Amino acid sequence: MVASGQAGRDLGRWNAAYPHVYPLDFSSLHTPGRYSIDVSGPVTAQSPTFDVADPSALFSGLAANSVRYLTTQRDGPNVAISVLRRQPSHVQDQRALVYATPSYRRGRLVGRLQRVGGPVNVAGGWMDAGDTLKYAETASFADVALLYSLRADPALPGAQDEAKFGLEWLLSLWRAHPRRLIYQVGLGNGNGRSILGAHDTTWALPERDSTLRAAPGTPSHFVKYRPAFRDGPPRAGTSPNLAGRLAAAYALGAQVFAHRDPALAARALKAARMIFASARTRHVGTLVTATPHAFYPEGEWRDDMELGAAELALTEHGATRARYLRQAARWATAYANSRLNGTDTFNLYDVAALAHTELWRAMHDFHVQELGGVSRATLAEDLKGQIGLAQRAASRDPFSLGTHYRDDDTVSHALGLSVEGPLLDGILKTSRYAPFAQTQRDFVLGDNAWGTSFVVGAGSRFPQCLHDPVANLDGSLNGSPPIMVGAVVPGPVNASDLRGLSLSRGYRPCPVKGGNDLRAFDGFGARYEDNVVASPTNEPSLDTAALGLLAFEQAAGK
């Protein structure tokens, strides 16, 4: 025994079986080594073994695994065969035809697809999740996170090649003449009869799609010959969320590759200027994210424009830099006055935390105290409001989670908060928000009611039954290698979201013996299930892994 102590105060009721939650604080233990905790008294328990070590030693491997997950998600001819036996997939994307945004009713395709151009080469990129589709919305978010991390930590294993791979694909989506953006590759939902999409077919590895017999007019034609969907007609402008976020990714690419690959950096900067200028910021309407929109129902865009302008300001020089700095301040003000401000925290749908931080950095670097009513202090105050929202939620939860289980995307919001706290501390030059950020990260890594990490490969228990064909068909089903390391699952959701779920034929049942050994720990209306069928809790995705990368890089001190 190296230390002893008493359980903390009762934090409240979790469910009928567990009416009391008591914290165990061993933060005074600093000596590196492997430990376990023994609980004695009226209740006895023993924890799994865990490491106490330098933060870099604990978290650098998790950050590298986040990059490895992106490598696993590669699509096209240049996949990593050494990762879960991946094989080239969707090679027909090299000559994809371009289509207008189709119509949907209740999640089903209405009418036929209308061709408006092509062929275009949109092969490559990252598959968004388990369904093999590719979106500018999520791929740009992931590459922003990767490039941001690489800028701070050039030694991050595998990051340079992966960031370049993602950037090249994002550049392939922007058609300079005319100024149009491809925002999605692949059809998710067809009509279930004459036109099938990725969600209408059997469970299979991505490479299967390229081998289908799928002549024009056959139901599977668009599964093999995947459509590339264009954002609006010519001269309509680009949806501002995508214009801002892709401008940010391109500009970050220009920063990161300025010396490593000057030609790529020049292409990226040119594209960043053009797509930012193309943003449709009047009469915006429904944002373009995915088809159908319900897949990714983003509602806010001013934060994306702020982020794009801030990254351009950090990339440019002289009068051009000043112009983008004014643009960033303009959109920071617009975001602060938006009806959605104060309703969300850092995640795929709200990047204000990163945008404010990068604008603050630009103002600091260029010795600007105030611009258009925006100061470093006002940026910090806006982020304090977001963190305050989360802290109020955490005060009502026995496990101090700063988001609501019933909002879905529980893990992505927790990871976002674990990133946002240190970003705000960086602006304020304090460590005030570090403990709260650590609590959110700890929740993701196992300090939760279910006692499981939600990151594959992290901890003694983590998800084994991913809702992902690559993991399910080419990986193990018991947590031993090969596994999809670095994948992050959505985590607990509203219990009603797990009713009536099923899968098409072809999957390997997991858990092998069935059942749900974690059900006794469901509470607060939330449920977590480690089951291949349970897509709401167990389908990993790009955006959640990207947040994991940012969180683990910060925790490692990078």
Q: Model-derived features: where do they sit?
A:
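Carboxylate/His-rich catalytic cores and anion/metal-binding grooves
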Residues: 159-187
